[in-house]
Amino acid sequence: MSEIREARLLKANSLVKKGFEPYAETFKITHSTKFLTEKFGYLENGQDFNLDVAIAGRVLAKRVMGKIAFYTIADQEGKIQLYLEKKILDDFEIHAKLLSFEDLKEIVDIGDWIGVYGTIKKTNKGELSIKVSKWEMLSKSLQPLPDKWHGLTDIEKRYRQRYLDLIVNPLSKNVFKTRAKCISLIRRWLDEKNFLEIETPILQSEAGGAEARPFITHHNTLDIPLYLRIATELHLKRMVVGGFEKVYELGRIFRNEGISTKHNPEFTSVEIYQAFSNYIDMMNLTEDLIRDIVLSCCDSLIINYQEKVIDFSKPWKRISMKDVVMEYTGIDFDSFNGDLNKAMKDLEESNIEISPKINTLGRLLNEVFEEKVESQLVEPTFVIDYPIEISPLARPHPENKEMVQRFELFIAGRELANAFSELIDPVDQRKRMQLQQSLRDAGDLEAHCIDEDFLQALEIGMPPTGGLGIGIDRLIMLLTNSPSIRDVITFPLLKPEITSTKSEKSTSNEVK
């Protein structure tokens, strides 16, 4: 690798000696590869079109055959072939201080960025090309690209060096184009329905709104601890109290938790709050929003995800947590009549392993659901009516005070969205937060803490409100058929790379 770098540094220095800059300041582009291929694909083989173009891209391939060369360059939108003749380039070189055909052969490597001027041509073999009249070096690459046939076989390297992954793997580039499109569509969809996008603090004095461990930092001037937000919920609810009836925030969330194919400590979500609504209204909103996003991004409401066919066109199933556990496991939690010991004994006899930390029937129900049911929910399914002890911010169910008006949406065996009829009773909310604080004091670092300012806001008065959170990264996984969350985050958090030796540093031929 160091020999290749040394050779390329020599080429960069040769440009300097000829009076050319190997790292250009700018280049004025007139067209993209996508525009040219779409606009001039109709040309007959061998036909020229006299349109002056200036185009730039990274060199991905080159073939030199005597006095003719064919290069392939890629920009953000696609690829195009360059047709280069020695006579044409050298004629221009005579009349102006330009780089020659020989310079091209000797200096340009795969991986370099070059800019070219020329006209449109379709070769005799039917390849749309730029007939180049002059060229410029825009950025000399000092390191070779991964082998084009084998690409990046090390999956970890794809994540660590995403720039290489994007160069050699068109599918990865498409993933992030889809991600950008999806996020733009969500914002537009909500804006058109008169939701107002709000920005809430990332640094917070209290980390609330979810059961999760926060990242902690320190503000030097104020000499206080601060937390990276684990949710936007409590601040968005304050905005509803303040009179904004339809609000949302799409942004980054930070949770100091494990890393897996489904979890990254830094992730993106959208939280949506709508006054005068309940969890049924938010269910309808969720179904409409995600269905529209799927259709816009995939051109179909039936998609393939990891060898599973998922149909978004049918009405989505809605089923209570108790009923879905009964359906998939045969366990009837109502038959326990509130007796936790009986439930634990029956589950043990059924060879279902349960954490010894489980201390309520509601938590036990949730544990069985997560262990035995969740992964089987492939088609879009709203699981509704959750235990109150795992939902401290949700409104109690009017027919069963041990449950709350909450749903989670599951697709392809993963949770994609979480929503409530929000708890707006300040007295009840204080009791729930006090219970959470006692759990936190007892060692549960994911339990909620008491947020006095939020409780004061509730006492001012919050209208009936439905709240919803959607995991953007998991949605992108579905839209792009990606098996891991790391595939859809540009630079996911990874374990530190272990290297046995320090990388060699070569300075002998640095560009002067």
Curated annotation (Swiss-Prot):
Record-linked InterPro entries: Aa-tRNA-synt_II (IPR004364), aa-tRNA-synth_II (IPR006195), aa-tRNA-synth_II/BPL/LPL (IPR045864), Lys-tRNA-ligase_II (IPR002313), Lys-tRNA-ligase_II_bac/euk (IPR034762), Lys-tRNA-ligase_II_N (IPR044136), Lys-tRNA-synth_II_C (IPR018149), NA-bd_OB-fold (IPR012340)
UniProt KW keywords: Aminoacyl-tRNA synthetase, ATP-binding, Cytoplasm, Ligase, Magnesium, Metal-binding, Nucleotide-binding, Protein biosynthesis
One GO location term (cellular component): cytosol
Gene Ontology molecular-function annotations: ATP binding; lysine-tRNA ligase activity; magnesium ion binding; tRNA binding
Keyword Transcription: no
Major localization class: cytoplasm
Reaction(s) the record says it catalyses: tRNA(Lys) + L-lysine + ATP = L-lysyl-tRNA(Lys) + AMP + diphosphate
Biological process terms in GO annotation: lysyl-tRNA aminoacylation
UniProt keyword Protein biosynthesis present: yes
Binding site for Mg(2+) 2: E415
Record-listed Mg(2+) 1 binding positions: E408, E415
EC number(s) recorded for this UniProt protein: 6.1.1.6
Compartment list: Cytoplasm
Cofactor binding comment, as recorded: Binds 3 Mg(2+) ions per subunit.
Family note: Belongs to the class-II aminoacyl-tRNA synthetase family.
Subunit structure as annotated in this protein's UniProt entry: Homodimer.
Protein name as it appears in the record: Lysine--tRNA ligase
Organism: Prochlorococcus marinus subsp. pastoris (strain CCMP1986 / NIES-2087 / MED4)
Lineage start: Bacteria, Bacillati, Cyanobacteriota, Cyanophyceae, Synechococcales
